[in-house]
Every structure is written in C-alpha cells, then in structure tokens.
Amino acid sequence: MFEKPVVKTFQYGNHTVTLETGVIARQATAAVMVTMDDTAVFVSVVGKKEAVPGQDFFPLTVNYQERTYAAGKIPGGFFKREGRPSEGETLTARLIDRPIRPLFPEGFNNEVQVIATVVSVNPDVQPDIPTMIGTSAALAISGIPFNGPIGAARVGHIDGQLVLNPSNTELNASRLDLVVAGTESAVLMVESEADNLTEEEMLSAVVFGHDQQQAVIKAINEFAAEVATPSWNWVAPEANTALNEKVADLAEAKLVEAYKITEKMARYDRIHEIAAEVNAVILAEDPEADAKEIHTIFHDLEKTVVRRSIIAGNPRIDGREKDMVRALDVRTGVLPRTHGSSLFTRGETQALVTATLGTQRDAQIIDELTGEKKDYFLLHYNFPPYCVGETGFVGSPKRREIGHGKLAKRGIAAVMPSIDEFPYTVRVVSEITESNGSSSMASVCGTSLALMDAGVPIKASVAGIAMGLVKEGDDFVVLSDILGDEDHLGDMDFKVAGTSTGITALQMDIKIEGITKEIMQIALNQAQGARKHILSVMDQAISGARDDISEFAPRIHTMKISADKIKDVIGKGGAVIRALTEETGTTIEIEDDGTIKIAATEGAAAKEAIRRIQEITAEVEVGVIYTGKVARLADFGAFVTILPGKDGLVHISQIADKRVEKVSDYLTEGQEVQVKVLEIDRQGRVRLSMKEAVEKPVEAEAPAAEEE
C-alpha cells in the first residue's frame, strides 16, 4: 500500500535523530516524523499553489500542538480534550516561525501552513528542538520556494563548559538556556535566558550552537536529495519599473524631509499626507493603476530613504547618533494602593508596571507533557491599541503579547529570590501606555523598579535595551535603543537584558544573511554601554528593595508544629482550618513537614491565628492548672475541655472536698472551671481535679529565656 518510506538517521550530540516521510499524511504538501530519543513530533506543511490576487503580504501560519497522549495522560477538565494553545505552545510556535519566515523569497505571497504535533515525549528531551528540525526538513522536501534548510540547537552552560542540547535534568544545573537557529552560513534567531553571563560567554554560546547545528543541516540536505521533490515553478513577480520611478519622482524628496520630523505622530501624519498625494496623482493619470501596488512601492521607498540616510552617517529619525539612548524618566510608587509600581519612560515608549504579592497558594500550576510544576513568578505584558494611537479589539492576549511577556520574564528571572528566601508568589503586569520601539525592554526596566518598590529582595537592578542594524553590502551601522520604524525598516532586532555585571536574557531576530560574529560582538558591546547608562538612571530613583513590603500586601508569618499535629490543625474534613481562616480573616498553608505559613494584611489577625494554632497543638502538662469548659456531665463525673480538641475527666470524687452525691448540683455544661491535671495514662486519657486546683494552685512555668 505504501511506497518505501525515506528514513534518515543521524547523531546529534548525545542524541539520535530520525527523519521519516512517505507513510503518514501523504496528501499534505510535505510531512515528516522526527524522533529524538523517544520524543517524536509530526510536522506537516501545506502550501497553496496560487496566491490570492492582489495580496501584498506572505500569509505564513505556524501551529504547534502538544497532545497529552504523548505523555500517556488524559486531559483534565470537563471535556477531556485539548483546547486552545497553552502559553508554552504559543511560545514554541513563535520559536519555529521566527527563523523560517525570512527564508521565503521576496514576493512569494502564497499561503503556507505548518502544523507540528507532539505525539510522543521523553520527559528529558524537550520537543522544541526536534520540532524546529522537523519543520526545516518538511519545508526542504516540500518543493515550496524556501532558502533553507535551517538547523536548531539548545546550548547550556554547566561547570564552565558549553553543552549541546542539555537534558531537562542538566538544565537545572545550567547557567544558560539558549536556543539558536540558522542556515549553513548565518545565524537567524536566538532566544535565551542566562544567569549573568558575560558578553563573551553569550557570543561563544551562539557561535557554538551554530557550529554544532551544521550536522542537522547536512542531514536535512541529504534527506531532501533522497526524497527528490521537484521544486515549484514559481517566478518572482517582475518589478514595475515605470511605477517605481514615478513614485520616487513624486515622493522621495518629500520623504527625506518627512523623516527629519522627530515626533512620531507628526511624522506619521506627514507621511500619510505624502502617500495620499502620490496616490491621487498616479490614479488621476492612470485610473487602472493598482492602489495596493502603489502602497507597496511607497513603503519600499520609505525603507530605502531611511536606510540610505543611516548608512551615510546622518542623524537618525529622531535626531540621535547611532549609540545614543533616548531621554529617560523613571518613577516609582506611582499607584497608591498597589504593592509596588513604577512608570518607566524612554522617549516615546512608556510602561506602567505593577507588582502584586500573594501567597504560595496563588502560584500558577503548569501542567506540561514533561510533568507538573509551580510558577511563583508571573509576568504579564499588555499592549492596548491606544499605546500607538489606534483603535482596536481588546481581549485575550495575542501571540506577540505572550512572547514579549516571556522575554521580559526571562530578563528578570535570574535576579528573583527563591521561594525559600521570599515566600510569596509575585505577579507583575506591564501595561504599555506608549510605544515607539522596544516596549518589551521597557517592561524589563519597569519590572525591576516595581519589584524593588514592592520590597521584593531582587539580587540586582535589571535593564533592557533593543539594538538594530542597517547593512548595505559591506557597510553596516549598529543602532542603540531602536525606534519602531528602525525595527521595521532595519535588518535585525537584537534585545539584551541584564545587570551591571552580566546578561540575563538575549533575543535576536535577523532578517538577512551575512550577520558576522564581528557585527554581533559590536552589538553586544554597544548594548552593554547603553544598559549601564539606563541602570545608572534607574538607580537614582531606587537602587535596592525597600526595607519593608507595602502595608496593603499580605504579611507571611511562619511557625512550625510537629508533623503529627497537622491532622489536629486541619480537623475532620478540613473543619478546623476552615473555621480558623474564616474567623481570623487569614490565609493558612500547611506543608508536610509541619511548617505553617499564615498570610494576613493585619498583624492582629495573624497573631490571633497563631495563638489558636498554638492552643490546638499544645500538649497537656501534668501538674498545670487550666481554665476549661464543662463539655458534658456523666453520673461518675464531668468531661472538661482544657485545650481545643482535648478533654479530660473530673471524677465525681475530685469535684469538691466534701462528698458529692450528684454532679449536676455542682456543674453545668458550658461552665468555666479551674482544673489541675493529675495524670495522663498510656492511652492519652487525662485525669483532672477541681479540688486540687483550689487547694494547691500551680501555675505553668514560663519558658526559660534563650541566651543570645
């Protein structure tokens, strides 16, 4: 039934990788099953043979989905099936998209969809690297115009050594988690999180990963040669030379002047005016002219004007030199009732950032294929339409917002205290209130400030900076603190976050080939100078965590009880702890070792909860007089509650000095009485006396003061 499948197996570091096609999904344009030590991902590619007429963009969609059966699990929830993509799936989809998108040829606007499905998972092998390899292989055998293949590698830094594709276990001991993707000759994408590594160490890791992934590229080329799919007969559309010249004649000089307007919205208004004028003139002369084509040519002319000016050494769009950072304004404590807040403004980019402290119960539970884990540090990034002066839909976060939030979180993670050092769940929200480039790095700066304002003992201040590149032939200029236009019209988006001593996150997206190690070195060094400048300004506002947390934040009090007393504090069906939390207005968490954490915004509430827990867990002592309540009466005596959950018996002979005929003549239920503990037998039963308490009062000894 099946033709003989094509299988390619190769060694990749410590892992064996297998590429296979020809058996599954034969109606797709291309399909590959990639396996890496029991982690298997099925990747399909479908491309439409024709583009939608008049379409002036490339509709590439990448879907990445993890099936729970891959880990031998059944999905939770009512419907028991996978639903919308998780944050992790969204981030992996972006990781696949970013290095392949620049490799489709200019003018290719046919729709292409990549669907990657994780069908088997080894808990020690993350699926993202095999997915990127499988996507590259599927595109290579599809016949679709694609200037690949690409390779992908994860790089760790363990005991001073770079490690290729470290396992999940090894990553726990690594100071670096870096993913690099690229072609045979160039790096295209870097995504990383680091523990204060130097610029040299980061660059070495990027180069190491790119060198090692050549084995992947070689294997995919051999695999594609064996499959031998004919290439599509696609020809790039011919340039409309006459229209290009017409648009340039009408607009070039005006655009040169427009790009000298430093204020963003005024500049945009002028550019829109020029575009409208050009459109009107050309359509008046030729009503059959394509307005979309005019728009595309006009945009290309904008790009040419800006790039040519930068390469010539002229001041940038907003008048800065290549290595200048925009004006900074840093404020903390801007919102009175939040636990921590900051307003970070850099030029026309602004982030309003808040930090909220919660208990460990507020941690996010992440159910991944490789296992369940808790996340005590959350960072959410919001990009509302008003921040760029537009209207638009407001709803659940888009892929870009999830990606930017994750990047900012990577930048801060290295300086966060452990849950043992600071027993709070911390949620940071960055609201982008103005945007003109590098809002994710503004979020890093704002987060560092808000955390300090909230009293979170982070190890150091963290700042982020976005670098750009304009390269024409052998000439290039590296730009610090890029504007949105410079990002859009340039060749590289290079984001670096770190402290004064090292890098904590690096993200790089390159749109062209030919980025050399020298260019990356210049960008890293230039970013270091910019980062230190921003840190110096931030430190003037706040240079360390506040001495105390906000009065509106919950204060966590820790106490320890014997592990065998946990059941007493919880009570039957949770009745005791439920009553404690409701009556004291606190949140109480009990760990298996007997550690109890009590969170309360008011100190009195916490003290009351502690007092009641101490009562519940206290041990009855022989010879001590207690004030108790009569719980019930019997013919032979009375049961008295002396501590919560602890009753003792006052025998009828121990009620008074004289003979007692009837217990109810002396006691009633609910009556408070003084009793002395006479004995605790082997079964834990407590024998009490009222008459001994009256005759020979013995007070409980105060605990001896501890010596300092």
UniProtKB/Swiss-Prot annotation:
* Residue ranges of domain S1 motif in the record: 623-691
Top EC group: transferase
Obligatory cofactor(s): Mg(2+)
Alphabetical keyword list: Cytoplasm, Magnesium, Metal-binding, Nucleotidyltransferase, RNA-binding, Transferase
The EC number of this protein is: 2.7.7.8
Q: Which GO terms describe its cellular component?
A: cytosol
Q: Which InterPro entries match?
A: ExoRNase_PH_dom1, ExoRNase_PH_dom2, ExoRNase_PH_dom2_sf, KH_dom, KH_dom_type_1, KH_dom_type_1_sf, NA-bd_OB-fold, PNPase
Q: Which residues bind Mg(2+)?
A: 487, 493
Q: Which domain of life is it from?
A: Bacteria
Compartments in which it is found: Cytoplasm
Gene Ontology molecular function: 3'-5'-RNA exonuclease activity; magnesium ion binding; polyribonucleotide nucleotidyltransferase activity; RNA binding
Give me any GO biological process, just one. Answer: RNA processing
Query: Transmembrane ranges?
Result: none
Extent of the signal sequence? none
Listed under catalytic activity are:
RNA(n+1) + phosphate = RNA(n) + a ribonucleoside 5'-diphosphate
Pfam families listed in its UniProt record: KH_1, PNPase, RNase_PH, RNase_PH_C, S1
Family that this chain belongs to: Belongs to the polyribonucleotide nucleotidyltransferase family.
Q: Entry's NCBIfam families?
A: polynuc_phos, PRK11824.1
- Please give the subunit comment from the record: Component of the RNA degradosome, which is a multiprotein complex involved in RNA processing and mRNA degradation.
PANTHER family in UniProt = POLYRIBONUCLEOTIDE NUCLEOTIDYLTRANSFERASE (PTHR11252), POLYRIBONUCLEOTIDE NUCLEOTIDYLTRANSFERASE 1, MITOCHONDRIAL (PTHR11252:SF0)
The UniProt function text for this chain reads: Involved in mRNA degradation. Catalyzes the phosphorolysis of single-stranded polyribonucleotides processively in the 3'- to 5'-direction.
The name on file for this protein is Polyribonucleotide nucleotidyltransferase
Q: Which organism is it from?
A: Vibrio vulnificus (strain YJ016)
Ranked from the top, the taxonomy reads: Bacteria, Pseudomonadati, Pseudomonadota, Gammaproteobacteria, Vibrionales
Designated gene of the protein: pnp
